[in-house]
């Protein structure tokens, strides 16, 4: 290879490396328990020889399609009479389902479905995917009609579910093959199943107290458990301190190497509160990160919201104010951590992570009226897997608005579509998803040791921020890549949570 060609290849490789920073490996794989039951009418099998076998073939196509989306599928066969429907309930309950697809392979009476609505606690999605895009009218037969009668009983089923007081979560309508829109709906529901699977099994730690006097942070842990299914485990700083006070030297050295391999540590630029990462701040960050990992393993946690100050100059103050690096690594690995005691946003970040779209801790920073953008970011924690390039660590001589000093994380998220969601609380105590879709734009960010991204939201920054604020959000929100309001609306239906997308109908 000539020198010029080699130089070109090297330049391209370097550019790719900068554009695609190393990813933090997920601690646990995404999964969900998804059931599929087909429905039909046993009278047809006697009248139309071969129809039952054709129904099984249709069901098999759909089940394989669901399996392709990273979920564990349990098939319950065809429910074709009231007795068969009732007999399936024990198996469905033992499968611990996160979601049930009801495959409407042909017309079925609602008695083949009603027991599922009455007995199961998971969301139910009706799927009507007919094999032919239309009947061959000149050569049509009753057999062919029944083979394509997937939608026929959908209104009957949805009406009965409403009368039971438990409406179905959704109806997917389309063609069995070659229908990208229907396939996307199925994919989205499997993503929602990932969220539901982990939410209702999660143990989220809660430590300390609300940062004085952020009223919007206050939330009832019982309401969180009732709505999302997760258990809120109450924790204390003294549970982490033994791991910090007596660290394993080899673990700390390995963590320091991991941190330095993952982050850049540039010289300070314009902010006098920042300096190049010091050896002391690296040591403290590594010790705190190791202590955090041992603590969450001991308590068997899946997320952690915290705020604590401790006595000035104490080891406790040093520990609890230096979680930022460790919690960013954990958040990126699928373990959401939320500062300022924001349990609601910890749930929002878990939702985004299980949708596999990131889930950075964020709030609004100054508006850029010249670019028609608003800076979105925070002082930690952050989902490093959605960074636009290698993230930066800076030593901060003090944290603005709170005690302590230490390493701070700085980066912008990837350019392109973004989604954000705040988990708000209404006056009646119920939760509300407040969602927006926008764009992450390239642009300079302040070198302050905090994350910042230029976010542009329609129709313009002033109108968007006013509409967002009037929906009553928590001032924190989860920030992710891609446009995913559709999945969040589905999740809202599954959980019975009001969902408002402020950038819709703009």
Feature-to-residue mapping (PLM):
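Long, internal scaffold/assembly segments composed of regular secondary structure
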Residues: 256-349, 353-354
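Short catalytic helix/loop segments, enriched in acidic residues and glycine
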Residues: 51-67
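Cap/lid and interdomain-hinge subdomains that line or gate substrate/regulatory clefts
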Residues: 30-34, 70-73, 133-270
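C-terminal catalytic subdomain
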Residues: 328-448
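Short, acidic/small-residue loops that bind anionic groups at enzyme active sites
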Residues: 115-140, 145-153, 327-340
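Short, well-structured alpha-helical segments in soluble
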Residues: 85-97, 114-116, 289-298
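Extended hydrophobic packing segments that form well-structured cores
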Residues: 401-506
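Periplasmic-binding protein-like
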Residues: 97-106, 125-127, 301-307
């Amino acid at each position: 290879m000539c020198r010029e060609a080699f130089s070109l290849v090297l330049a391209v490789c370097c550019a790719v490396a900068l554009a695609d920073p190393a990813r933090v490996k997920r601690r646990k794989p995404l999964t969900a328990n998804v059931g599929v039951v087909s429905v039909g009418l046993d009278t047809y099998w006697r009248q139309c020889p071969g129809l039952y076998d054709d129904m099984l073939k249709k069901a098999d196509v759909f089940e394989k399609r669901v399996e392709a989306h990273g979920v564990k599928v349990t098939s319950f066969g065809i429910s074709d009479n009231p007795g068969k429907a009732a007999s399936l309930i024990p198996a469905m309950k033992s499968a611990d389902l996160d979601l049930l697809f009801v495959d409407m392979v042909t017309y079925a009476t609602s008695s083949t479905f009603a027991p599922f609505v009455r007995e199961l606690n998971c969301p139910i999605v009706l799927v009507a995917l007919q094999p032919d895009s239309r009947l061959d009218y000149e050569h049509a037969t009753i057999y062919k009609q029944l083979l394509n009668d997937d939608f026929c009983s959908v209104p009957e089923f949805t009406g009965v579910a409403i009368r039971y007081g438990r409406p179905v979560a959704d109806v997917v309508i389309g063609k069995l093959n070659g229908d990208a829109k229907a396939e996307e709906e199925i994919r989205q529901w499997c993503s929602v199943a990932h969220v539901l699977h982990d939410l209702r099994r999660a143990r989220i730690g809660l430590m300390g107290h609300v940062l004085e006097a952020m009223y919007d942070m206050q939330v009832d842990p019982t309401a969180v458990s009732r709505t999302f299914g997760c258990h809120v485990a109450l924790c204390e700083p003294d549970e982490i301190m033994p791991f910090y006070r007596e660290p394993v030297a080899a673990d700390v050295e390995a963590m320091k190497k991991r941190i330095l391999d993952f982050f850049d540590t540039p010289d300070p630029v314009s902010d006098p509160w920042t300096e190049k990462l010091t050896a002391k701040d690296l040591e403290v960050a590594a010790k705190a990160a190791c202590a955090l990992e041992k603590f969450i393993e001991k308590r068997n946690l899946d997320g952690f919201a915290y705020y604590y100050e401790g006595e000035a100059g104490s080891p406790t103050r040093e520990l609890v104010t230096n979680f930022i690096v460790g919690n960013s690594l954990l958040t990126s690995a699928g373990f959401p951590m939320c500062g300022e005691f924001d349990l609601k946003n910890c749930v929002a970040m878990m939702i985004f992570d299980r949708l596999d779209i990131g889930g950075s801790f964020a709030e609004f920073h100054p508006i850029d009226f010249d670019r028609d953008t608003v800076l979105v970011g925070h002082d930690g924690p952050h989902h490093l897997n959605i960074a636009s390039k290698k993230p930066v660590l800076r030593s901060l001589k003090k944290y603005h608005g709170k005690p302590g000093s230490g390493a701070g994380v700085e980066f912008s998220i990837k350019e392109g579509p973004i989604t954000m969601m705040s988990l708000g609380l209404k006056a009646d105590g119920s939760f509300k998803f407040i969602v927006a879709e926008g764009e992450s734009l390239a642009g300079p960010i302040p070198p302050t040791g905090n994350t910042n991204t230029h976010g542009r939201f329609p129709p313009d920054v002033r109108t968007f921020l006013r509409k967002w604020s009037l929906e009553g959000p928590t001032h924190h929100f989860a920030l992710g890549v891609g446009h995913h309001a559709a999945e969040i609306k589905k999740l809202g239906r599954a959980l019975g949570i009001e969902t408002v997308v402020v950038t819709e109908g703009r």
